[in-house]
Amino acid sequence: MKKEPFNPTIFYANPSFIRRYQSKYAKIFLPGETVLDVGCGSGIFLELLQERQVNGIGIDTSAEVLRDGIAKGLHIEHGDALSYLKKKKNLYDGIMLSHIIEHLHPPDLINLLELANKRLKPNGRVIVITPNFKDIDVATSTFWLDITHVRPYPLPLLKQLFEYSGFSVVSMGNDPDTGGGRPPYSRVLSFIRYIYRKIRFGQYSGKGDIFLIAKKIG
């Protein structure tokens, strides 16, 4: 297999941290429901769904990172979200978009949200998790470590895009469980940067990730 030119997983949080902070999102779904995890990677969120008897389906563009999930027997397919949702006519109870939207240009994100709306059952939910640019660590360092990142999406803009695409926003805000789990060099400086940003950059008051949960209208 040809080696991929860039492997962003070297900057990922450790699996136990991802599992810990994503567990609350898995609890949104009920046993027997079907959830599509876009950009599922090795399948951590799919495992959390499986533990709750929720039917999880994962897709990812990186054949390299999804091999572990396939080896675990998880339902994972290789492909990108836009092509997958155009071809698949299945209806889902939920769609998970964890650290996906920052890789998309605005027209592609709107296209993705409109396709997601078509593929969701009535009252189906979408969960978005994305970097928080009010975290100075994110804005000045970690966001730019991934060369596939296109742009950040702050919550007011996300809310507008979801409502434009036929969703009602249920909740949104800072994810209190993120902001840790990054590479050690980031954690060592976290306290110093926290004090500095409070003094020098008062507006950079966020931490870690932001989230938005939306429901299909109708």
Description of each model-found segment:
Residues 110-122:
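A short glycine-rich, Lys/Arg-flanked "PGG" loop and its adjoining helix->strand segment in the class I
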Residues 128-149:
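Short, glycine-/aromatic-enriched active-site segment of Class I SAM-dependent methyltransferases
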Residues 150-165:
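Short alpha-helix
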